[in-house]
């Protein structure tokens, strides 16, 4: 495992950086410490919310329980619409975790004044403001749809690369690379651009002028979380393919 990590860190792409970072050294690895800090904060928020919602469950939900049940119902419907009636249940936790994590990450960047917290080097920002986070999430989705396809269809899964004709093999292989690329760079680019625009406006103009832009940022941040989760569910549903008929029934 360690030789693979050293091989990855030796590649030129592993040395690409955006902005200044607060580094932590773990053995021979150099990681972005500010991303770990904000990621742990987001994870803590989600864990506390889940515990608060499930601590004293009521038959008639209210407060945080009502909010979490609404989120669960929304995620369940989203997953069902993309995978069909008989396949979606096993994937609700995965898609839901992606959606909630990205949603809270994005909103933390829009609502929390991370830049007021001083670090020895670099600055805090939303975890999804770092390309490493979005690439990791996209690779998780890639592993998930490969796993779903192999689990559902076995080795027949690989026949999709030569259907309906072997001529499409290069395009099918290329698609497996473009999916995680588009997922990661879309999310990273939108969140980074939003935080940069708001940051510049706050420096140049009074407080009340950037407020509409911040409100728009909250909306686009939620949309990006929805887009990522929807595409993840779609890719997993397409990989299984055995649900084709059920998928059509779910939309009929």
Swiss-Prot record:
How this chain sits in the membrane, per its record, is:
Multi-pass membrane protein
Q: Where are the transmembrane segments?
A: 33-53, 92-112, 130-150, 196-216, 217-237
The protein's matches in Pfam families, at most eight in alphabetical order, are given as:
ATP-synt_A
Checking SUPFAM superfamilies in the record gives: F1F0 ATP synthase subunit A
Residues of the signal sequence?
Answer: none
> Which cysteine residues pair off into disulfide bonds?
none
Q: Which GO terms describe its cellular component?
A: plasma membrane-derived thylakoid membrane; proton-transporting ATP synthase complex
One Gene Ontology term of the molecular function aspect: proton-transporting ATP synthase activity, rotational mechanism
- Which Gene3D superfamilies did the record assign? ATP synthase, F0 complex, subunit A
Q: Where in the cell is it found?
A: Cellular thylakoid membrane
Task: Describe its partners and assembly state.
Answer: F-type ATPases have 2 components, CF(1) - the catalytic core - and CF(0) - the membrane proton channel. CF(1) has five subunits: alpha(3), beta(3), gamma(1), delta(1), epsilon(1). CF(0) has three main subunits: a(1), b(2) and c(9-12). The alpha and beta chains form an alternating ring which encloses part of the gamma chain. CF(1) is attached to CF(0) by a central stalk formed by the gamma and epsilon chains, while a peripheral stalk is formed by the delta and b chains.
Described function: Key component of the proton channel; it plays a direct role in the translocation of protons across the membrane.
Q: What PANTHER family does UniProt report for this protein, alphabetically?
A: ATP SYNTHASE SUBUNIT A, CHLOROPLASTIC
Q: Which family is annotated?
A: Belongs to the ATPase A chain family.
Name of the protein in its database record? ATP synthase subunit a
* Organism listed in the record: Synechococcus sp. (strain PCC 6716)
Lineage from the top down? Bacteria, Bacillati, Cyanobacteriota, Cyanophyceae, Synechococcales
- Identify the coding gene: atpB
């Amino acid at each position: 495992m360690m030789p693979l990590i050293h091989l990855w860190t030796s590649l030129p792409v592993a040395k690409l950086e955006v902005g200044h970072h607060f580094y932590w050294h773990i053995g021979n690895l150099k990681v972005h410490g500010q991303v770990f800090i904000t990621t742990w904060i987001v994870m803590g928020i989600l864990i506390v919310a889940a515990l608060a919602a499930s601590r004293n469950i009521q038959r008639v939900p209210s407060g945080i329980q009502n909010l979490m049940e609404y989120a669960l119902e929304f995620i369940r419907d989203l997953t069902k619409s993309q995978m069909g009636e008989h396949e979606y249940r096993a994937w609700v936790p995965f898609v839901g975790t992606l959606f909630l994590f990205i949603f809270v990450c994005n909103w933390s960047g829009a609502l929390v004044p991370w830049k007021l917290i001083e670090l020895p080097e670099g600055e805090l920002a939303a975890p999804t403001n770092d390309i490493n986070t979005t690439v990791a999430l996209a690779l998780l989705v890639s592993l998930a749809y490969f796993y779903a396809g192999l689990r559902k269809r076995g080795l027949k899964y690989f026949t999709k690369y030569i259907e309906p004709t072997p001529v499409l093999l290069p395009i099918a292989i290329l698609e497996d690379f473009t999916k995680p690329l588009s997922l990661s760079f879309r999310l990273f680019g939108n969140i980074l651009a939003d935080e940069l625009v708001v940051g510049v406006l706050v420096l140049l103009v009074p407080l009340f002028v950037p407020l509409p832009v911040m409100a728009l940022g909250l909306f686009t941040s939620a949309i990006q979380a929805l887009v990522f989760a929807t595409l993840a569910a779609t890719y997993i549903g397409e990989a299984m393919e055995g649900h084709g008929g059920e998928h059509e029934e779910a939309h009929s």
